[in-house]
Amino acid sequence: MASPARKWPSREGFTADVLTNWVQRLLLDPWKLVPILALAQYTVKGREIIESRPHLLKAIKTLTTLAVLQRLSAWLDRRSINNAVSDHYIWNKEVIVLTGGSGGIGRRIAQLLGDRDIKVAILDISPPDPSNPLPHTVRFHKCDITSPTAIADAAAQIRTTFGRPTILINNAGLLTGRTILGTTPQETRAMFEVNSLAHYWLAQEFLPDMVSNNHGMVVTVASQAGYAVTPNMVDYSATKAAAIAFHEGLAAELVTRYHAPRVRTVLVTQSFTRTTLIDRLTPEDSFMNPLLWPETVAEALVKQVLKGESGHVMVPGSSGYVAERLRGYPLWFQHSIRCQLERLMRAGN
């Protein structure tokens, strides 16, 4: 399905994320609120306005406090997950390994990175569509990422043609959209091998060079389904929960076990996206949980990668906020949400 041109306010239209961004910019920007508060308290005109509207000063103080605390929390988050150390990326010298880059979100990621003349090695079982060629810095390597031997062979080719990879993007994924009883052992096993276990095999191949140089990045493309288990895709949810655990554990091991604090880790948790993975399903497309275009997810991921920093890319933030915190809610609420999710993923057995 062809993506629409990027439009205002977003490809997905007017969504909760768009509204939230507007509120952030208009009402929770400390660079705007602090001067307004100063004018209200320390200028003659400001005091005159406040005296006639006493509740206005209280509102400004409340918003300013919230805005400052929010920025402080974000700064602490950023400092913590980057281990309080900086790093520098020279993009024409970096080498990116991208799994599942022949189609869907991965194809868009390869395009965006290639457009910047960044070297990208795609690992996939099928080549990209030749009718829409990728930039010259993007190369395809046929590889079964569930096989450590195949990964090692592809890695040798990449090191010969591109050099040693510095960034690994674990993007490949499988989804059958079937119930627990309706899925075959082969389907479930394949899903875990691609969505979860391959992350370990790929890290074991490419991470040692990053650790030895104390430079690099591992991007884990998971899913909001990893937070909110959904009927008709329980196995998929389990694989993505495992991918999230891989990301979190790797981030801690890089500091405590490998002493490589500059190796970055990025987690991507997206909602339903218009790719072939959901062809059999009936995902929601609403204000709170819009059906995403692959370009939207790819752009958010690439933006974070180009920062050269660890981070969490959550798209959309509205549904992700609820999903990420679901297990902290009362059991009755958790169960009702999971049961409601069934109608979004109704696709046969």
Which residues fall in each region the model found?
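Canonical Rossmann dinucleotide-binding motif of NAD(H)/NADP(H)-dependent dehydrogenases/reductases
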Residues: 78-120
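Conserved NAD(P)H cofactor-binding loop of Rossmann-fold oxidoreductase domains
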Residues: 171-178
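Substrate-binding pocket helix/loop in short-chain dehydrogenase/reductase
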Residues: 179-180, 184-189
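Active-site loop-to-helix junction immediately N-terminal to the catalytic Tyr of the SDR YXXXK motif
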Residues: 183, 229-237
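Active-site helix of classical SDR
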Residues: 203, 239
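Residue(s) in the substrate-gating loop at a strand-loop-helix junction
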Residues: 223
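SDR active-site lid
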Residues: 255-317
